[in-house]
Regions:
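Glycine-rich phosphate/pyrophosphate-binding loop shared by adenosine-nucleotide-utilizing enzymes
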Residues: 3, 54-59, 74
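Conserved beta-strand in the GNAT
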Residues: 49, 55-64, 80
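A conserved beta-turn-beta hairpin within the catalytic core of GNAT-like acetyltransferases
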Residues: 65-76, 86, 132-133
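Conserved N-terminal entry element of GNAT/NAT acetyltransferase domains
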Residues: 1-11
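A short helix-loop-beta-strand connector motif used in the catalytic cores of GNAT acetyltransferases and
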Residues: 39-49, 75
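Conserved active-site alpha-helix within GNAT-family acetyltransferase domains
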Residues: 92, 116-134, 139
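Conserved acetyl-CoA-binding loop-helix of GNAT-fold acetyltransferases
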Residues: 81, 87-100, 127
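Conserved GNAT acetyl-CoA-binding A-motif
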Residues: 95, 102-114
């Protein structure tokens, strides 16, 4: 394995759609995901890829903001690593790389949301020092 972590340029954001589709709601189509990602890259958003040589095997979005309770923070979004690359320490290396990257940009905290049913991810994040602070609620208004 030749693992590298790289920022995915905005003009190449379409490469993440197949990976994110694997973890998203089945009713969200690939064309809709692509449309949303093309809009996201125009906001305070970056996307980091995990590459094995030239093959994209993992991804995480980063939303940059300032919050009253955590200061300058980055929210991890749609964190995903292909099944064949899991349970090999790659997730910890990825989060550590992200932490160093965002700290170098002057950010103070990392936050994320995890689906309630995704217990393995909860255990992973807790082992990595994340603390549960609350629930994330969504209400569609469209």
């Amino acid at each position: 394995m030749q693992i590298q972590f790289k920022i995915i340029p905005a003009e190449s954001i379409d490469v993440v759609v197949p990976l994110v589709k694997k973890m998203s709601n089945p009713s969200i189509t690939e064309p809709l995901l692509l449309k949303r990602f093309k809009e996201m890259v125009t906001q305070n958003y970056e996307c980091i890829g995990v590459y094995d040589a030239e093959k994209l095997v993992g991804v995480s979005g980063l939303w940059f903001c300032t919050r009253h309770y955590s200061g300058r923070s980055v929210e991890l979004d749609h964190v995903f690593i292909e099944d064949a690359y899991r349970n090999k320490g790659l997730g910890s290396k990825f989060v550590n790389w992200i932490q160093r990257y965002v700290k170098s940009k002057g950010y103070e905290a990392i936050e994320l949301n995890a689906y309630i049913a995704n217990e393995p991810s909860h255990k992973f994040y807790e082992r990595d020092g994340f603390q549960k602070l609350g629930y994330h609620f969504v209400k569609e208004i469209g």
